[in-house]
């Protein structure tokens, strides 16, 4: 869950949280690095992050290069969490299940190319979640139109609301 100022890393097995940690790394840090590297405002850095992100073809890879130190830390932390799970899962949870995928949520999971970079770095499938997928079958209410990339910012809120509805 990549937020504005921090990222929560959560391992779920069979729908149950078995490990969680938070790191002080989020979209604001991406923007600060871009603003400093390109001498632009925070707003221009935010637009650069969303529109160019990790696209090596844009601006001769300069935006990618500016973001790389931060996304590399994120990849390292994810790798550390996966390793921790594999080292400790059997004694804590029985036979360990392999981590098959990394689901990205949070407003700053929208960093262009992040899922591709992380998939390559971790050698695990990474993808942007769809927080509204299957969220309300059989319920007589509607959710205002929301694009998938916008819904990522509300994944936690949607999950908490669904917990109350399904209870």
Name the predicted role of every residue range.
Residues 1-167:
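Hydrophobic/aromatic-enriched cytosolic interaction surfaces used to assemble or bind macromolecules
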């Amino acid at each position: 869950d990549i937020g504005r100022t921090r990222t929560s890393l959560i391992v779920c097995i069979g729908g149950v949280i078995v490990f969680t940690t938070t790191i002080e790394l989020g979209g604001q840090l991406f923007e600060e690095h871009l603003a400093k590297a390109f001498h632009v405002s925070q707003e221009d850095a935010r637009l650069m992050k969303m529109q160019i992100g990790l696209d090596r073809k844009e601006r001769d890879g300069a935006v990618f290069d500016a973001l790389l130190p931060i996304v590399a830390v994120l990849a390292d932390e994810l790798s550390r969490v996966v390793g921790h799970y594999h080292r400790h899962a059997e004694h804590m949870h029985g036979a360990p299940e392999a981590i098959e995928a990394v689901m990205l949520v949070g407003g700053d999971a929208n960093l262009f190319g992040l899922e591709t970079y992380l998939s390559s770095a971790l050698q695990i499938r990474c993808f942007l979640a769809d927080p509204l997928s299957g969220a309300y079958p059989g319920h007589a209410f509607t959710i205002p139109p929301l694009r998938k990339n916008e819904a990522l910012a509300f994944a936690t809120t949607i999950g908490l609301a669904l917990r109350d509805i399904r209870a």
